[in-house]
């Protein structure tokens, strides 16, 4: 009678095999989590950079538009008195004021408005008054262009030299600077805007 030999195959897993599988699974999950977190962080950083770049570009366009459309007429104070200047700028006060032509959908009022740029609470702020000669110092539309601004410097070119205020003397009261420069730091990055007003004539009464 032939001898029958049978083999018993254990289809289950041993405790060691289960533990090894759990360790491998944990490592896979950890690596996947790290990769996912890194991808999300990269996406957030990219999104922030795009937003900052977009904000910078838009702000630059607005500032350049205002300055290139400057109207060379004497400014008045809130009492209607002439200020002996067609543009007033002071790097110490971090402020520049002038009249500019602003596009409007309404034909009921003059397109010439008083525009003011200044550093306020570490932000580059644009104020647009409702007329070229406002009598109410609080009647304006305010726009925060750039936040977290440090070391803002405003300078004005005349006779190939930069000056930190305008007008620099009586001879420059009726003219516009050749160039206007904004230098500032945002998020530890330095930026420089140099804008040409495109006005080479003096105001005459």
What residue spans do the PLM features occupy?
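Short aromatic-glycine motifs in intrinsically disordered, low-complexity regions
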Residues: 131-143
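Short linear sequence signals and composition-biased patches located at protein termini or domain-edge surfaces
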Residues: 150-205
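Short, surface-exposed coil-to-beta transition loops
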Residues: 109-114, 139-140, 177
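Extracytoplasmic beta-strand-rich oligomerization domains located immediately C-terminal to a leader/signal peptide
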Residues: 40-133
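N-terminal leader/signal peptides at the extreme start of proteins
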Residues: 1-11
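Structured surface patches comprising rigid loops and adjacent beta-strands/short helices at the edges
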Residues: 73, 143-156
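Short beta-strand segments
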Residues: 113-115, 141-143, 189-193
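N-terminal single-pass transmembrane signal-anchor helix
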Residues: 9-36
